[in-house]
Amino acid sequence: MANYILSLDQGTTSSRAILFTREGDIKQIAQKEFTQIYPQPGWVEHNANEIFDTQSYVMRECLQFAGVDASDVAAIGITNQRETTVVWDKKTGAPIHNAIVWQDRRTAGFCDELKAKGLADVIRQKTGLVIDAYFSGTKVRWILDNVPGAREKADKGELLFGTIDSWLIWNLTKGAVHVTDESNASRTLLFNINTGAWDDELLAIIGVPAAMLPRVSKSSEVVGEIHPEFLGKALPIAGNAGDQQAATYGNACLKEGMAKNTYGTGCFMLMNTGKAPRPSNNNLLTTMAWATPSGRYFALEGSVFIAGAVVQWLRDGLGIIQSAPEVEQLALSVPDNGGVFLVPAFAGLGAPHWDQYARGAMVGITRGATKAHIARAALESIALQTLDIMDCMQKDAGIKLDTLRADGGATRNNLLMQFQADVLGVPVERPMVTETTALGAAYLAGLAVGFWKSEEEIAAMWQLDRRFEPNMAQSDRDKLLHDWQRAVARSKAWIEA
């Protein structure tokens, strides 16, 4: 009997493979960063071949470092940066353009055209999404319109589109399987979350031929096998979900009303709303959570584009710190932000503002401001953006959160977690296993092959590492929020369309 599940966690800045035990513990992690490509301001690309090469490399390295043979792996689960778009040649398997990343803003003008045509309501009703350059559909259209001959080839069925999960599965199966799951499909602007299928009207609006699209599977389902050349054995690919949905599952937010926030490159709060889509009146997204044999589940989501990436900027852009972990000690060297607020709208503002033309702003700077105040303001911006979303989520769901589960790399920062609890006014729980994105993909894969028997078994494995209790006076919280909202207002509509 196999003893492990292997998760492939394809993120925005690195590809990782994580081996999980039957108890849901981490046996081994392998990670490799890849190149970020910025052709011009507001554009972000990845080399799709480099993504696959790094992912297949860490997949092998993970098992090698663990001393585990592929025959001891029951299944593979995949989770991925969502919305990032690849278009490739069906015959050769070669991408016709770099992958356009979820952060990329080049299609903002086309999104404005769709809004001007009065299409926002029909798109929201069918997809649960807002019209924004964030989502995959407009990125596909851009590639077809800007790569010579691409649209003609797409119309003939010679090109394929996929989010990163589709691209990985296509390559791992040597072109035998072209598939995505409902959670990833629901992030394209092309998928009707009510019918659970690609939508002809949406395809016509965006301008994407149906022949390019992958089959849509459940999130927990055997969709194919990886080719034996990769690990020496054909293993079932049995779980697949976008990173934030996978993190919600991995954090065992399996009951209606439970919520988690993932602190990664961006920040993403999801609340499980059960088996019915919950429309948002506060500029949040209604999205698929996952589809399993027990049914189709939905979530409310608030997406923050820049969270952990602001710490990368402190390191790589400003040189304030040499490594990401240093930011906590630097920020702790001052008692507060000194009146400095940083709005990291480097790629516009996501929920609940949805301002494609906002840009980063730092306000409240005096001669007494230091790099420590800037570091503290950067960390606080992550928590304050999360507060904006939680307020909207509680209104939409009609549920007052009593606890927020947190995951992702930045949760290791105790200052950030405590400040988050302080400004939210509710406890923040950090799980023992913070790699919940990969864990969620593992759970979905394990369920599909009987490695785990039920969601009740999975929920019982969740373990608390630390609970951060709120410890801030309401008056202080109100003042912070007031000044934060003033700072956000100054970042909006900075680019003149």
Swiss-Prot record:
Which amino acid positions bind ADP, per UniProt? T12, R16, T265, G308, G409, N413
A single GO cellular-component term from the record reads:
cytosol
Give yes or no: UniProt keyword Transferase: yes
Report the top EC class in one word: transferase
PROSITE patterns, alphabetized:
FGGY_KINASES_1 (PS00933), FGGY_KINASES_2 (PS00445)
Task: Name the positions where sn-glycerol 3-phosphate binds.
Answer: T12, R82, E83, Y134, D243
UniProt-annotated binding residues for glycerol: R82, E83, Y134, D243, Q244
Q: Name one GO molecular function term.
A: glycerol kinase activity
**Family to which this protein belongs:** Belongs to the FGGY kinase family.
- The protein here is known as Glycerol kinase
Name of the gene encoding the protein in the UniProt record: glpK
